[in-house]
From Swiss-Prot:
This is Probable cytosol aminopeptidase. Mn(2+) 1 binds at D250, D327, E329. One of its GO terms (molecular function) is metalloaminopeptidase activity. It catalyses: Release of an N-terminal amino acid, Xaa-|-Yaa-, in which Xaa is preferably Leu, but may be other amino acids including Pro although not Arg or Lys, and Yaa may be Pro. Amino acid amides and methyl esters are also readily hydrolyzed, but rates on arylamides are exceedingly low; Release of an N-terminal amino acid, preferentially leucine, but not glutamic or aspartic acids. Belongs to the peptidase M17 family. The lineage of its organism: Bacteria, Bacillati, Bacillota, Bacilli, Bacillales. Presumably involved in the processing and regular turnover of intracellular proteins. Catalyzes the removal of unsubstituted N-terminal amino acids from various peptides.
């Protein structure tokens, strides 16, 4: 996708404009349809109803066609409503293979240039496939008429690109996106943007005593990786640590998943994808903040060496864990990753994981579940998600749940107290390793993928939380 800003007098193939039921049409748009526009609006040939689209040829040579986007009553249009209008318009153009497009941002409320660039990038994303019959990709060339500077376009395009990177990773099959391949993806990002990168190998983990991460990896023939990225934009300030679960395929181990539940487990590294998407955005936009990214990467397989229910393992923090469910593996890899992140003395820790099926039961597929030990941290993050429309909902992090995680006859903790309240148990387990550090846990198991296409993209991976994470860390500088 290419973005340009040029003189409005240039020749235009398709011009996208907003049209409202209670605001006059700008004269330069009216001039394209001498003595006709008001009549067409009056009889419904051009609709001002919110979400209605009309593509019409013009009566002049400067602009070939105009796509009218109905805004309804413009003052009642929310940011997310506007986002979905742009997404619908972008997909309308894509369906007709109209690739050279000019958008008159001045006809939309507040000239939302960043939102236009972001949404066009998100909504026209194409899922990578591995079919032998290739297809032509939609190569969009967009020009914006606006008083806003290029920086707004760059921000929106960068956030869309970063989100789409996360989408691509979540979609990749587990035989191609192994732990070493995920480490390579991190290396590509680090080299492209100059981030600091460290990759811990299995021997390094053994030396550090990462028994929880290593236990999950025991059944695999593919070695684990602990991926550590650093973005330094604020000197010696303490970093914000972002930890993403990177289980590249999850069989459930000996607590094996059913045949329907195991399909799609290539996407059990959605948290890791969000972290890498964040670092892609940081590299493009360079805010004045320090960010640490930690990704524990492994698959969870079955073999004669795999860990088992009733095993007792020792984490990097020294806490012992009774294994009651080998399919509760995400919290184990996060435990060691969070412990490692604390070595950097971060000002806060945010972890993201496709952690539990329980969050889908509780909140469905539109809302991410959250736990926290810091109300202010949650409130600041929630405020950001209301702008990005990546909704979160805080679940109770209270003693009644914490005590059940600590209930074991043979170890300090157990990894799966039961199914009732399962989402909270998963987060509370991770909370046992954060100590007093301000911490936010995000369970994205319901929001990491969508079962049907929307105005913001095709079915499948969503790249959830990339945009919210970026806006949050930028404001925490």
């Amino acid at each position: 996708m290419r973005w340009n800003q040029v003189d409005p007098q240039a020749h235009v193939e398709v011009l996208v404009v907003g049209i409202s039921g209670n605001q006059p049409v700008e004269e330069r748009i009216r001039s394209l349809y001498p003595d006709r526009l008001d009549e067409w609006v009056r009889r419904g040939d051009i609709s001002t109803k919110q979400g209605e689209l009309r593509l019409l040829p013009t009566l002049t040579g400067t602009v070939e066609r105009v796509l009218f986007v109905g805004l309804g009553k413009a003052e009642g249009l929310t940011t997310d409503g506007l986002r979905r209008l742009f997404g619908k318009a972008a997909q309308f153009l894509k369906a007709r293979q109209l690739s050279k497009v000019t958008i008159d941002a001045t006809t939309f409320p507040d000239q939302p240039v960043e939102l236009i660039a972001e949404t066009f990038g998100l909504s026209t994303y194409e899922v990578k496939h591995y079919k032998t019959n290739t297809r032509a990709t939609y190569d969009l060339d967009v020009t914006i008429w606006s008083d806003a500077g290029e920086q707004a376009v760059e921000r929106g395009a960068a956030l869309a690109q970063a989100t789409n990177l996360a989408r691509r990773l979540v979609t990749m099959p587990g035989n191609l996106l192994t732990a070493p391949a995920l480490a390579d993806e991190a290396r590509f990002i680090a080299e492209r943007h100059g981030h600091e990168l460290k990759i811990l190998e299995k021997a390094d983990m053994e030396a550090l005593g990462m028994g929880a991460l290593l236990a999950v990896n025991q059944g695999s023939t593919i070695p684990p990786k602990l991926i550590v990225l650093e973005y330094k934009g604020a000197g010696d300030d303490a970093p914000i640590a972002v930890v993403g679960k990177g289980v590249t395929f999850d069989t459930g181990g000996y607590s094996i998943k059913p045949k329907d539940g195991i399909v799609g487990m290539k996407g059990d590294m959605g948290g890791a994808a969000a972290v890498l998407g964040l670092f892609e955005a940081l590299g493009h936009l360079k805010p004045n903040v320090n960010v640490l990214g930690v990704i524990p990467a492994t698959d969870n397989m079955i073999s004669g060496d795999a860990f088992k229910p009733d095993d007792v393992i020792t984490s990097m923090a020294g806490k012992t864990i009774e294994i009651l469910n080998t399919d509760a593996e995400g919290r184990l890899v996060l435990a060691d990753a969070v412990t490692y992140a604390k070595e950097y003395k971060p000002k806060m820790i945010i972890d993201l994981a496709t952690l539990t099926g329980g969050v889908l039961v509780a909140l469905g597929t539109e809302i991410t579940g959250a736990l926290t030990n810091d109300a202010g941290l949650y409130e600041r993050f929630e405020a950001v998600t209301k702008e990005t429309n990546e909704m979160v909902w805080q679940m109770p992090y209270v003693d009644q749940f914490i005590k059940q995680v600590r209930r074991s006859d043979v170890a300090d903790l157990n990894n799966s107290p039961g199914r009732m309240g399962h989402m909270i148990f998963g987060g509370a387990f991770v909370g046992e390793f954060v100590g007093d550090t301000p911490w936010l846990h995000l369970d994205i198991a319901g929001t990491s993928e969508q079962k049907a296409a929307t105005e913001l993209g095709p079915k499948g991976a969503t790249g959830v939380m990339v945009r919210s994470l970026y806006h949050f860390v930028e404001r925490e500088k």
